[in-house]
UniProtKB/Swiss-Prot annotation:
This is Glycerol kinase. ADP binds at residues 12, 16, 267, 310, 411, 415. Its EC number is 2.7.1.30. It comes from the Bacteria. It comes from Clostridium perfringens (strain 13 / Type A). GO terms for biological process: glycerol catabolic process; glycerol metabolic process; glycerol-3-phosphate metabolic process. InterPro entries: ATPase_NBD (IPR043129), Carb_kinase_FGGY (IPR000577), Carb_kinase_FGGY_CS (IPR018483), FGGY_C (IPR018485), FGGY_N (IPR018484), Glycerol_kin (IPR005999).
Length: 500
């Protein structure tokens, strides 16, 4: 009987289920979007029951579509939007509040208050690898406990559970029998110590979070529990792989070795570098995070995020309306020889790594009477590559060694103009894989390894093939000249929203 691996890919806007075979071919895909809830400006929520309902229905749907029963499934792997926080009642399994999404800024005030505490900012950097920010789960848990009536009392009595989305899905799939997370997701909570690989007692105390709420932290590849996908008495399918979305993509790109780098070009860009067993502290405000946890050992990674990547293309389409389809950008960008001296800095929500300026705002500089639509489209596309170079330079500076290539994935990696310009700008080879579903593939690999579907990482590495490679075509002098101009444009955007 042919066996398959199912990856559940629970993202920020949709839940997906993808079936892979042993040769990593995609046998079937199902996807359902769910509601984004915006109760106030800067607040973002999801309904945890809707997350579960959409995720379970796409799992059933893809199995039916491919005519596959649970007997055919060797294991289930889970990958998920990170940091998003769910708190539920241990006895009823009902969430006490909506999921607070990673994008939600409601806990910024809590962060400001914590910044006043003696040495806490440095302690967080040193022990969790993160920066004190509303992005991470810790302050979101505190907010729920402080603001939902009766929550703190229930938590003190051990009646509430916390989990990131992976924990919630495992809890639901196992009918409330298993409460776990993996090292990668734990490393995004701001309450997990990435040195001793334990929940951090000081952070729990600072945020007033009872230890009893927290899931057990496990490897990213092991059997956590079993899901019964059919009627009672049916075959139980092992749930055997978990990783946060960006770490799953790193694993799905077979970036197993120290110095391997991947960039996911989505709405934002996420650049991760595997630093092996070395925990590298960034001097440039990059995050130190756990890349993967296997056999009780972890590999670390440096992570830098660009807030506005592919979103700049959506802006050209939806707000400026100078393109009708995202794929048009490549056509228009190649109709001009260069950017005509125009630079777009898409600091719509400030600038992330390595600038960390929340008051920066978007700018278009270098306009002349000869500037046309094509120059602006080209400059907007180029901004994605410039921001990636900024993060990559910071990474190389932090680790003290160079890299050979960048493995790429995500929607905007389909744009060949952008990929060639990226290669030109960083002076490195840019490689696209044959399977672009790297996040789901990473979760599938982790699940498959745990049940012996694939024997080891070496076997997986042999399955990884490039579909396209882009080599630099311009001189070092020229790329540095371009970049110098970009840096000048960035300076113009900094601090713009500060009150005079």
């Amino acid at each position: 009987m042919k066996k398959y691996i199912v990856a559940l890919d629970q993202g920020t806007t949709s839940s997906r289920a993808i079936i892979f075979d042993k040769e990593q071919n995609i046998i079937g895909v199902s996807q359902k979007e769910f509601n984004q809830i915006y109760p106030r400006e800067g607040w973002v929520e999801h309904d945890p029951m809707e997350i579960w309902a959409t995720q379970y229905s796409v799992l059933q749907e893809v199995m039916a579509k491919c005519n596959i029963t649970q007997e055919n499934i060797a294991a289930i792997g889970i990958t998920n939007q990170r940091e998003t926080t769910i708190v539920w009642d241990k006895n009823t399994g009902v969430p006490i509040y909506n999921a607070i999404v990673w994008q939600c800024r409601r806990t910024a005030d809590i962060c400001d208050e914590l910044k006043e505490r003696d040495g806490l900012v440095d302690y967080i950097r040193e022990n969790t690898g993160l920066v004190l920010d509303a992005y991470f789960s810790g302050t979101k848990i505190k907010w729920i406990l402080d603001n939902v009536e009766g929550a703190r009392e229930k938590a003190e009595k051990g009646e509430l559970l916390f989990g990131t989305v992976d924990s919630w899905l495992v809890w639901k799939l196992t009918n409330g029998k298993v409460h776990v997370t993996d090292y990668t997701n734990a490393s995004r909570t701001m309450i997990f110590n990435i040195k001793n690989l334990q929940w951090d007692e000081r952070m729990l105390k600072e945020l007033d979070i009872p230890r009893s709420m927290l899931p057990e932290v496990k490897n990213s590849s092991e059997i956590y529990g079993y899901a019964n996908l059919g009627a009672k008495g049916g075959i139980r399918v092992p749930i055997a792989g978990i990783a946060g979305d960006q770490q799953a993509a790193l694993f799905g790109q077979a970036a197993f070795n120290k110095g391997d780098v991947k960039n996911t070009y989505g709405t934002g860009c996420f650049l991760l570098m595997n630093t092996g067993e070395e925990l590298v502290k960034s001097k440039s405000g990059l995050l130190t995070t756990i890349a993967i946890g296997l056999h009780g050992k972890v590999q670390y990674a440096l992570e830098g995020s660009v807030f506005v990547g592919g979103a700049v293309i959506q802006w050209l389409r939806d707000e400026l309306r100078i393109i009708s389809d995202s794929s048009d950008t490549e056509y228009f960008a190649t109709k001009v020889e260069d950017n005509g001296g125009v630079y777009v800095v898409p600091a719509f929500v400030g600038l992330g790594a390595p600038y960390w300026d929340m008051y920066a705002r978007g700018t278009i500089v270098g306009l002349t009477r000869g500037t046309n639509r094509n120059h602006i489209i080209r400059a907007a596309l180029e901004s994605i590559a410039y921001q990636t170079r900024d993060v990559l330079e910071a990474m190389i500076n932090d680790v003290g060694y160079d890299i050979n290539c960048i493995k790429v994935d995500g929607g905007a990696s389909r744009n060949n103009f952008l990929m060639q310009f990226q290669s030109d700008l960083v002076g490195k080879k840019v490689i696209k894989p044959i399977i672009t579903e790297t996040t789901a593939l990473g979760a599938a690999y982790l699940a498959g390894l745990a049940v012996g579907y694939w024997s080891d990482k070496e076997e997986i590495a042999k399955l990884w093939f490039a579909s396209e490679e882009f080599e630099p075509t311009i001189s070092e002098e020229r790329r540095n000249k371009y970049h110098k101009k970009w840096k000048k444009a960035v300076e113009r955007s900094k601090g713009w929203a500060l009150e005079d």
